[in-house]
């Protein structure tokens, strides 16, 4: 099975280990990975900031780059959601709307692909300790991926998963929201960190690097002893 990887901006610039883990897990599951070097940003930051025409140019480039893929997989629920929004963005342009739909139909978030397409629930990972899961907004509310991360983590040997209080609450990142509405964002992430600490977890695990960088940065500034990990890193662990 051929998988074309969209690594995302944050993985490319800040969390390259997440990209490596994503590839290694998928290859271990029998996938052949392709990485088009022409890939750029999915256009979400520009689109959410109101720069629609600039965003469309990036989106058209991404459609051209990925439309011949068999499956498109990304370690980000937020970016996968943006791919699924492409047909709506181009709703007044039938030609591009059709091409956008073709791309959207074969785009999956990393854990969604493993559980729903590969039909795998245990990847053979092991990581001793206690974890809690942050469920990112776009991934759960818009993409509809709610159970896949928990299913996979429940089968990681040695790992105990505890429910995160107020799990439905946003961490305050929201892309450019954290820059434009900083005081509100800071209050939101403080509340998220309080919830994490309440669980007594050794690890905070999530599927979106934006959320994890936001929460992890706050945890570090507050001097808390919790390790933040992307789920791809956890599923690639053999401790």
Swiss-Prot record:
* Signal peptide range in chain numbering: none
The processes (GO biological process) annotated in the record are: lactate metabolic process
Q: Which cysteines are joined by disulfide bonds?
A: none
Query: What's this protein's name?
Result: Lactate utilization protein A
Q: Which gene encodes it?
A: lutA
What organism does the record attribute this protein to?
A: Bacillus cereus (strain ATCC 14579 / DSM 31 / CCUG 7414 / JCM 2152 / NBRC 15305 / NCIMB 9373 / NCTC 2599 / NRRL B-3711)
Q: Which family does it belong to?
A: Belongs to the LutA/YkgE family.
Select a single GO molecular function from the record's annotations and give it. oxidoreductase activity
For this protein, the record's HAMAP family field holds: LutA
Instruction: Extract one GO cellular component term from the record.
Output: cytosol
State the function annotated in the UniProt record: Is involved in L-lactate degradation and allows cells to grow with lactate as the sole carbon source.
């Amino acid at each position: 099975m051929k998988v074309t990887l969209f690594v995302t901006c944050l993985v490319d610039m800040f969390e390259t280990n997440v990209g490596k883990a994503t590839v290694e897990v998928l290859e271990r599951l029998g996938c052949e990975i392709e990485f088009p070097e022409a890939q750029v940003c999915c256009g979400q930051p520009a689109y959410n900031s109101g720069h629609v025409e600039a965003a469309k140019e990036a989106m058209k480039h991404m459609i051209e780059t990925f439309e011949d893929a068999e499956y498109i997989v990304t370690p980000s629920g937020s970016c996968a959601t943006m791919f699924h929004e492409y047909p709506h963005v181009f709703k007044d342009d039938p030609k591009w709307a059709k091409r956008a739909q073709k791309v959207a139909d074969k785009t999956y978030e990393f854990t969604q692909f493993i559980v729903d397409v590969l039909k795998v629930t245990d990847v053979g990972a092991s990581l001793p300790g206690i974890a809690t899961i942050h469920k990112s907004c776009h991934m759960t509310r818009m993409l509809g991926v709610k159970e896949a991360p928990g299913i996979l983590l429940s089968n990681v040997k040695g790992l105990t998963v505890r429910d995160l209080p107020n799990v439905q609450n946003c961490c305050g990142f929201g892309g450019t929201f954290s820059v434009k509405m900083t005081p509100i964002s800071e209050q939101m992430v403080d509340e998220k960190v309080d919830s994490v600490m309440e669980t007594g977890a050794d690890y905070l695990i999530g599927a979106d690097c934006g959320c994890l960088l936001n929460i992890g940065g706050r945890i570090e500034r507050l001097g808390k002893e919790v390790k933040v990990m992307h789920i791809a890193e956890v599923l690639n662990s053999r401790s």
